[in-house]
Design a protein with these regions (language model features):
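Solvent-exposed loop/turn segments at secondary-structure junctions
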Residues: 1, 31-36, 65-69, 107-108, ...
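Conserved redox-active cysteine motifs that mediate thiol-disulfide chemistry
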Residues: 1-11
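Helix-adjacent hinge/juxtasegments
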Residues: 2-3, 15-60
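Short amphipathic alpha-helical segments and helix-helix/interface helices
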Residues: 9-17, 89, 133
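Structural recognition of the beta-strand scaffold that forms the well-ordered cores
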Residues: 24-30, 59-63, 98-103, 108-111
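Short, internal strand/loop/helix patches
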Residues: 27, 43-96
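Short aromatic-enriched loop/helix-cap "lid" or pocket-rim segments at secondary-structure transitions
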Residues: 38-41, 74, 113-114
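Thiol-/selenol-based redox modules, centered on thioredoxin-like
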Residues: 86, 94-140
């Protein structure tokens, strides 16, 4: 299920690029609590060993840490090191499958949980997909 949502976001990113929209960026941040889980088949970087993948995803993927490096200066009150939560997830107050949309200045435009708002264009008559796409386009 998670791979499907990440795959849909990858497809949306490629769709935007094909439409000539190249001033938006996507990335995934794996939660600290999931750092010991295999995510290869979720991000589809190993097609030979992942039966759920048609193509390699192009969206960059990174790992959240709990080392406090992001809890300095203006973020001091937002997170703390070694609390068993990732620093970035603490700062943004996210949960599993949250999609964060930022504007050009890095300000929050929207936070949507993809567990409850399936982005698949074949679900909800494409309404969630279109809403997410429009939020991204309007944040540019």
């Amino acid at each position: 299920m998670c791979r499907a949502r990440f795959g849909v976001l990858n497809d949306l990113y490629l769709e935007l690029l094909n439409e000539g929209i190249d001033d938006v960026k996507f990335m995934g941040i794996n939660g600290f609590n999931y750092s010991n889980h295999s995510f290869n088949c979720m991000i589809c970087d190993d097609l030979e060993n992942c039966s759920n993948c048609d193509n390699i995803n192009t969206i960059p993927w990174t790992q959240d840490l709990d080392d406090g490096q992001n809890c300095l200066d203006q973020n001091q009150e937002l997170c703390e090191p070694n609390d068993e939560n990732g620093d970035v997830w603490d700062i943004w107050n996210v949960i599993l499958r949250d999609l964060i949309i930022l504007d050009r200045e890095g300000k929050l435009v929207a936070k949507i949980n993809l567990t409850y708002n399936n982005p698949d264009p074949t679900s909800t008559c494409g309404e969630n997909y279109d809403t997410i796409k429009n939020l991204i386009l309007n944040a540019r």
